[in-house]
């Protein structure tokens, strides 16, 4: 079992929580600077750990909120930074809308590899409650977030986030600046919710995107025919794979299709059932 000690606290690293602690202060300074965080912001830090990022945020904002699930680390933060509002809980379980009742949140964090995708989707679902999110995550996941069409990285995650947020890959972080050292490199990204989006029904669009990318090697027709009415879509588009369409084209396609009523047979290419 790997153990990490800092000041008066020693913990057994929990792999299931994806715990890798950042040790390079230059990196934490870059993250805070890139976030644009200031004294007037309502800041939320996800998973402060031993406070590497926390102490840098305090340089620009004297009081903010942190969410920490690990009991020992929560006790450390409570003792080391009593001026902070500590929520000892799983970030995935907290009510972001309620937390943002006083104004939208600027989110920062070195987030666990193991739950990166659920965290991103929670932020996406609660995008009206945040100003921005500046997050460190596994490099491969960061690359998927900013992927472009017709690449192997381009998929559900890229489409969902880029439809509703401006996403930027900021910089890469090598694995040697963490304790314990992970087997992969990391990267820092930023996501800012868009004010105007091409899609109104986010949940319906999410279902559509998941269906369109369900089997990447299949055409849009084969992935969508059992779930949507496709009469309004030209045959040339239906012969393509989802990965070939830009964010804008997928949004346009979504507007053309209608969910297939329960019990209706799938659509044939000629428009008949």
Swiss-Prot record:
Which SUPFAM superfamilies does the entry link to? S-adenosyl-L-methionine-dependent methyltransferases
Q: Which Gene3D superfamilies match?
A: Ribosomal RNA adenine dimethylase-like, domain 2 (1.10.8.100), Vaccinia Virus protein VP39 (3.40.50.150)
- Keyword terms: Cytoplasm, Methyltransferase, RNA-binding, rRNA processing, S-adenosyl-L-methionine, Transferase
One MF term in the entry's GO annotations: RNA binding
Query: Where does the source fall among the domains of life?
Result: Bacteria
Instruction: Specify which residues bind S-adenosyl-L-methionine according to the UniProt entry for this protein.
Output: 20, 22, 47, 68, 90, 110
Q: Chief subcellular site? A: cytoplasm
Please verify whether the record's keywords include rRNA-binding. Answer: no
Which reaction(s) does the protein catalyse, per the Swiss-Prot or TrEMBL entry? adenosine(1518)/adenosine(1519) in 16S rRNA + 4 S-adenosyl-L-methionine = N(6)-dimethyladenosine(1518)/N(6)-dimethyladenosine(1519) in 16S rRNA + 4 S-adenosyl-L-homocysteine + 4 H(+)
- Per the UniProt entry, the Enzyme Commission number(s) are 2.1.1.182
Alphabetized PROSITE patterns for the sequence: RRNA_A_DIMETH, SAM_RNA_A_N6_MT
The answer on whether this UniProt entry bears the keyword Repeat reads no
A Pfam family found in this protein is RrnaAD
- Could you give one GO CC term from the UniProt record? cytosol
Which compartments is it annotated to reside in? Cytoplasm
- PANTHER family tied to this protein: DIMETHYLADENOSINE TRANSFERASE (PTHR11727), DIMETHYLADENOSINE TRANSFERASE-RELATED (PTHR11727:SF7)
| Function (record text) | Specifically dimethylates two adjacent adenosines (A1518 and A1519) in the loop of a conserved hairpin near the 3'-end of 16S rRNA in the 30S particle. May play a critical role in biogenesis of 30S subunits.
Q: What family does the Swiss-Prot or TrEMBL record give for this protein? A: Belongs to the class I-like SAM-binding methyltransferase superfamily. rRNA adenine N(6)-methyltransferase family. RsmA subfamily.
Q: What is this protein called?
A: Ribosomal RNA small subunit methyltransferase A
Which gene name does the record give?
Answer: rsmA
